[in-house]
Design a protein with these regions (language model features):
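Beta-strand-rich modules
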Residues: 244-263
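Short beta-strand segments within Ig-like beta-sandwich modules, predominantly Fibronectin type-III
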Residues: 229-236
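Solvent-exposed loop/turn segments flanking beta-strands in beta-repeat/beta-sandwich domains
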Residues: 205-225, 263
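Exposed aromatic-hydrophobic patches
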Residues: 237-244
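Residue-level signal for short segments within beta-strands and strand-turn junctions
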Residues: 51, 219-223, 256-258
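Middle-to-C-terminal accessory/interaction subdomains
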Residues: 3-43, 50-212, 279-280, 284-297
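Beta-sandwich strand segments
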Residues: 261-275
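An aromatic-rich alpha-helical recognition segment common to small helix-rich domains
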Residues: 200-202, 217, 252-254
Length: 298
């Protein structure tokens, strides 16, 4: 019954889903912790779901935090991850439960409160005190074998990472409030080829302030979009078309912009050695005219 309620957009989150299946306060505080620590790989996994015996209610429990508070480390090793739409509430827009929570005003008020309370709790003095304590326990092992083999940074960079922990929490707190101004991410469809015309389409974006949204569509032969094949701005409908290019590898990028000028990438991303290229889908036009989407499995 739960999947039916969640996927039925006419069902009430307050009167049906929250009243029976989930505790909104539990979800709000769980989300607030993930948002403040930048633990982005929690959209649909790395969470423990618990339902007490003889109960229909499910609770989210924190689990697997190995991706949290790593922004400075990724910057040092020049690896692109947890950026773009993965910052702020847009990170959870692709999950039906979280999306419907975020579309519910009463839940957003709960989440605002949870963010403020946890941000106050995770203050600079507390975090720096905890860092000093845990460092005194763990640091001697970090630089010993075999652990030393797996540390991707130097002693000096280790100091930089430690100094960046609380500022990252502070930054993530700001990202939360800013993310409501942006259009929400969306998926790009697999292009189709018909009668010499390449059809390009994508899902519509969503704006919390109900602002009008337009799209910028780009097609290129490379993921850096230096070899541009097609570009169109101010597209209102979630589709466009262009003359079919020759067989080969192509990249499509779509960005949504609202009336206030805030821009969002698509959910899709292309993976290279240095991480994610956000908002980009790769596909191939075969010699026989069929279109094959490039897929990536983690």
């Amino acid at each position: 019954a739960l999947p039916i309620f969640l996927n039925d957009e006419s069902s009430s989150m307050d009167e049906e889903v929250f009243a029976r299946y989930f505790d909104p306060e539990n979800i709000a505080y769980w989300l607030a912790f993930q948002l403040l620590t930048g633990n982005t790989d929690t959209q649909s996994r790395n969470v423990y779901l618990y339902s007490p015996q003889n109960s229909d209610c499910w609770y989210l429990l924190d689990w697997d935090n190995d991706g949290m508070l790593r922004r400075k480390e990724r910057e040092i090793i020049q690896f692109s991850d947890s950026e773009s739409w993965e910052r702020g509430v847009s990170n959870y827009w692709g999950n039906v439960l979280f999306r419907r929570c975020l579309q519910t005003e009463s839940f957003r008020q709960l989440l605002d409160t949870a963010m403020d309370e946890l941000y106050a709790y995770m203050n600079q003095d507390r975090i720096e005190s905890m860092l000093a304590h845990y460092r005194s326990v763990t640091e001697e092992y970090v630089w010993r074998m075999p652990d030393r083999l797996y540390v991707p940074i130097t002693h000096e960079q280790y100091e930089e990472v430690l100094e960046s922990i609380w500022p990252e929490i502070d930054e993530d707190y700001d990202y939360y409030w800013e993310s409501y101004h942006n259009p929400m991410p969306f998926y790009i469809g697999t292009p189709s080829l018909q009668n010499g015309v390449l059809q390009l389409s994508w899902d519509t974006s969503y704006d919390f302030n109900a602002e009008d949204i337009s799209y910028t569509v780009e097609l290129a032969r490379d993921y850096q979009f230096r070899q541009m094949v097609y570009r169109e701005e101010h597209v209102v409908l979630p589709l466009t078309q262009t003359a079919a290019p020759a067989a080969g590898q192509y990249f499509i990028r779509v960005r949504a912009t609202n009336t206030s000028g805030y821009t969002q990438d698509a959910f899709d991303y292309y993976v290279i050695d240095s991480g994610k290229v956000y908002g980009v889908k790769c596909f191939y036009i075969q010699p026989d005219g069929t279109v094959v989407e490039d897929t990536y499995e983690e």
